[in-house]
Structures are given as structure tokens and as C-alpha cells.
UniProtKB/Swiss-Prot annotation:
It comes from Mus musculus (Mouse). One of its GO terms (molecular function) is GTP-dependent protein binding. The lineage of its organism: Eukaryota, Metazoa, Chordata, Craniata, Vertebrata. The keyword Acetylation applies. It is found in: Golgi apparatus; Cytoplasm; Cytoplasm, Cytoskeleton, Spindle. This is Dynein light chain Tctex-type 1. Residues 41-113 are annotated as: Interaction with GNB1. Keywords: Acetylation, Cell cycle, Cell division, Cytoplasm, Cytoskeleton, Dynein, Golgi apparatus, Microtubule, Mitosis, Motor protein, Neurogenesis, Phosphoprotein, Transport. It holds the Pfam family Tctex-1.
Amino acid sequence: MEDFQASEETAFVVDEVSSIVKEAIESAIGGNAYQHSKVNQWTTNVLEQTLSQLTKLGRPFKYIVTCVIMQKNGAGLHSASSCFWDSSTDGSCTVRWENKTMYCIVSTFGLSI
């Protein structure tokens, strides 16, 4: 049982991280319509809130968080990432959030210390 708890405390838990990211997006953007002039503020708020909440978990990780906000206008977006890490402890998750006027895509990487 102790081994399970120890591994739980040092593992990257995708569901937990996704929940934190979704809350940060809702808090920063909420029901707003896309406004180009607000995008820098929104991305900064999403990133700061996400990192703040992840840090409060007190887990032995370094975090990397990226945020893309784009207007819904029919344009496509393709991205990729590649990591060389220990898949038993490190992890990543991507959250895609949308409303009628925009997409917000947040990728979070957790690297065990």
C-alpha cells in the first residue's frame, strides 16, 4: 500500500492536471468572445493559474505549460511535440477548450525531479 501511495505522489496524474487546466481556462476566459487585444492577457492568466495550482500540489516535478488561443475562422492548426523521458514518472496532457468564437489549447508537461 505504501508503494502505491509513493508512486501516486511521484506520478504525473493526467486527470488531476487536466482538471486544473480546465479550471484555469474557465477562470481566465470564461464566457468571453474572442478579442485579439485580450489574447496576451488571457494566455498569461491561463499559464500563471495553471502553474500556480500545479505547484501547490507539492509534487516533485518541473512543469512546462504552453497555451494557444486562436479565433474560430476555419483555419487549421497542426502541432507536434517529442520528449525523451522516463514514461513511468514523467507525463503530459493536452486540453482543448472551445466556445463559439475561439479555441484554447493548453499542453502541460511534468518532468520528475
